[in-house]
Amino acid sequence: MRRTAAETRELVLDVASRLFYWQGIRATGVDKIAAEAGVSPNVLYRAFATKDDLVAAYVARSREQSQARFDTAIAAAGPDPRAGILAMFDALAEDIRPEVFRGCACMMTLAEFPDEALPAHQGAVGAKTWVRERFGELAGQLGVAEPEVLADQLSIIWEGTNSTAQAMGADGPPASARALVTAILDHHKPSR
């Protein structure tokens, strides 16, 4: 079966994304990705010039999918920014179920790629920045006195939920995230 270059690129990225997430980026070689995708390493390198390019595409895809999922949850919650914030955490609770969660893809990427000059590192930081900025937008819509402070607090809960789910499971400390978010939101009263 012949594929277009775009189809081959998507196939390689699909396989690489699965392997990178479940087995680790550095632990997954290009030869393994090519074999599982049913392409030669030369074909893989035509789609992605280097493994670093493939990793950057994996991070970009993960970021795009997450942002779309969280934006959809916010939109479904309606115009109330408080409901939007809670919807983001409800979506996160779905994402950290053990059958689909090994850990935060961006945090795992940052652990494996600490060099700030690498596109994968920059993409992972960008994803984390987006979450904080999204919380900032919603906090601003709430009309609280210090939306940046609320955004930071929500980001800390977000990251804590991700990391404790990875270490202790979704039924451990992450099960308290929504209650903690509700308490934080109750503490930050609108200034208007």
Language-model features and meaning:
Residues V55-S62, R69:
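Alpha-helical DNA-contacting segments of helix-turn-helix folds
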Residues A83, P98-L118:
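Amphipathic alpha-helical segments used for helix-helix packing
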Residues L11, V15-D53, A57:
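Helix-turn-helix
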Residues R9-E10, V30, D52, A56, ...:
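Short, structured helix-loop boundary elements
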Residues E146-A165, S176-A183:
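Hydrophobic alpha-helical segments that form the core
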Residues M1-E7, K189-R192:
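N-terminal intrinsically disordered/low-complexity leader segments
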